[in-house]
Amino acid sequence: MSDFAAKWDQDGKRFYEIGVDRGVFYPLSDEGTYENGEAWSGLSNVTNKPEGADVNDVWADNMKYLSIRAAEKFGATIECYSYPDGFKACNGEEEVVPGVTVSGQTRKAFGFSYRSRIGNDIKFQDYGYKIHLIYKATASPVEKSYGTINDSTDVDAMSYDVETTGLEVGTINGIEYRPTSHIEIDSTKVDPALLATFEEIIYGIEGSTTPKMPLPAEVFELFGGSVVPSIEINKHL
């Protein structure tokens, strides 16, 4: 029997992803930056929903000549039991006077980050994690019901469908990339020192800096990419 180069189910290489935590909300400033982030407690689920990329078959010479795919866009669903005060403006709510809020206002764009765990068969969910960055997102209106209190312990959850607009990435290490609104950072593959610096940026340092989400080109530059932006980094709106 041949000794195959491909190896299946080796110890330490049975990977999976689980969990969601460390959510952070970042309001989009008029200058196109994502600063003054707020911790988003109460996250219960985040679903990434890429859409588009529909296939269009081209026929010639009485046969299928080729397949072309349309552009892809990124969306998500955020499920939670609460949200930070700053998210109210992104939900079409404005506090007119302290404690009194009106709805139906302009929905502002925002940035969002969260963490998912990476597990394996040895370290389980402590093997590593991914940090997800979502840019220039807007939340769609959703219904919210209020039910009577009874002998069950169900808590009313909220769910927000999110659409995004891609930001310029530029040319990195000689390769030109399309605009994106979603980036993942894998803790098991990046330099730990650079990751620590990155986390200080996106989560802030108590008593020193507030959470800030770097723009895509800034993220790649921090982790060692040689970036040539196609337009000025902070002039993407």
Whereabouts are the PLM-identified features?
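Short amphipathic beta-strand and strand-loop transition segments with alternating hydrophobic
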Residues: 25, 44-48, 64-66, 139-147
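Acidic Ser/Thr/Pro-rich low-complexity disordered segments
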Residues: 33-34, 116-128, 172-181, 188-190
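Oligomerization/assembly interface segments of phage tail-like spikes and tubes
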Residues: 48-50, 59, 63-87, 153-167
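Polar/acidic, low-complexity leader/linker segments enriched in S/T/G and N/D
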Residues: 1-48
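Structured, beta-strand-rich domain cores
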Residues: 64-140
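Short, charge-rich amphipathic segments
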Residues: 3-12, 25-31, 90-96, 114-120, ...
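Mixed-charge, glycine-accented linear interaction segment located at domain edges/termini
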Residues: 141-235
